Amino acid sequence: MRGKVSLEEAFELPKFAAQTKEKAELYIAPNNRDRYFEEILNPCGNRLELSNKHGIGYTIYSIYSPGPQGWTERAECEEYARECNDYISGEIANHKDRMGAFAALSMHDPKQASEELTRCVKELGFLGALVNDVQHAGPEGETHIFYDQPEWDIFWQTCVDLDVPFYLHPEPPFGSYLRNQYEGRKYLIGPPVSFANGVSLHVLGMIVNGVFDRFPKLKVILGHLGEHIPGDFWRIEHWFEHCSRPLAKSRGDVFAEKPLLHYFRNNIWLTTSGNFSTETLKFCVEHVGAERILFSVDSPYEHIDVGCGWYDDNAKAIMEAVGGEKAYKDIGRDNAKKLFKLGKFYDSEA
């Protein structure tokens, strides 16, 4: 398929190449690191050539993980996020028909995060924000700032007012959490377990704490076909309905006003990033609808040729899985065009 839109694609500032290499040792195989470093530090290098070769018409770039969420000092974090945004804006300036960007944000303070998001959308033309799970603060990043509490309503209102999506992306564990949880099970860091554990806790916290009830027009994107949540749709809702909601009501606590699937069908989109499983895609489409699914690769953690090869080489099987050619094209391109209000781009009408 030509003109695919891919929207979970990472970069890092070249000045932090050494730190990037250190963090890559957590979950990038030794024989894959040279390619990884070349791509993550050069968003407009051979990745554009690979996009041409494999039918990606438009790429939305975002800062790599943990990005600003790993900066524990507020002032330094805000400076780094702004530098990331200015850098990627400059990098893609000559490729506006091929590339866009998500804002990197310091999430130490909701008001400042709102201001930087507004700057990025209104002045730099960015398409939303991507944040790498919780914001770390304090010694060794021991304080985890979640965005599911009422003090973050000012930020969510900004997202709604700007009418842009918020991508909640995973981050690697570090500090005492890394030592306590993963020192003896380091090969579960990243896609096998740790990424999904963090994001699923966070987005479910947003649901049960009423964020989407207070902001019914809020748009949130989850990668990797839902961070393990879809497989537990029934069990989560079963427990919400028969235990959690009655408990919350008896205690006078806030709780989600609607069934779990309501939020996944009205507020949340899922991407195929790093989860190139036709069977899992079919399951997600059956539960949330093809209109809630967006193609993505997750480069440079995943290979562009692998992600695109799955979608293109298995087109017939995927069409059967998702409900036909229209749904196939919607997932590959047209859902993203609608969500991000994209104009014409390379192969956008192919």
Curated annotation (Swiss-Prot):
Query: How far does the signal peptide extend, from start to end residue?
Result: none
Among the GO biological process terms of this entry, one is: secondary metabolic process
Q: What is its EC number?
A: 4.1.1.91
GO MF = carboxy-lyase activity; hydrolase activity
The record ties this protein, via Gene3D superfamilies, to: Metal-dependent hydrolases
Free-text activity regulation comment from the record: Inhibited by AgNO(3), HgCl(2), p-chloromercuribenzoic acid and NiCl(2).
Per the record, its GO cellular-component terms are: cytosol
Tell me which SUPFAM superfamilies the record gives: Metallo-dependent hydrolases
Reported temperature dependence:
Optimum temperature is 40 degrees Celsius for the decarboxylase activity and 30 degrees Celsius for carboxylase activity.
Variation of activity with pH: Optimum pH is 5.5 for decarboxylase activity.
Q: Name one Pfam family in it.
A: Amidohydro_2
Catalytic activity, reaction form: salicylate + H(+) = phenol + CO2
InterPro entries recorded for this chain? ACMSD, Amidohydro-rel, Metal_Hydrolase
What keywords sit in the KW lines?
Decarboxylase, Lyase
- What does the sequence similarity comment in the record state about its family? Belongs to the metallo-dependent hydrolases superfamily.
Record note on quaternary structure: Homotetramer.
User: What is the role of the protein in this entry?
Assistant: Reversibly catalyzes the regioselective carboxylation of phenol to form salicylic acid. Involved in a pathway for the degradation of salicylate via phenol. Also catalyzes the decarboxylation of beta-resorcylic acid (2,4-dihydroxybenzoic acid) into resorcinol (1,3-dihydroxybenzene), gamma-resorcylic acid (2,6-dihydroxybenzoic acid) into resorcinol, 2,3-dihydroxybenzoic acid into catechol (1,2-dihydroxybenzene), and 4-aminosalicylic acid into 3-aminophenol.
What is the protein name given in its UniProt record?
A: Salicylate decarboxylase
Originating species: Cutaneotrichosporon moniliiforme (Yeast)
Gene this protein is translated from:
sdc
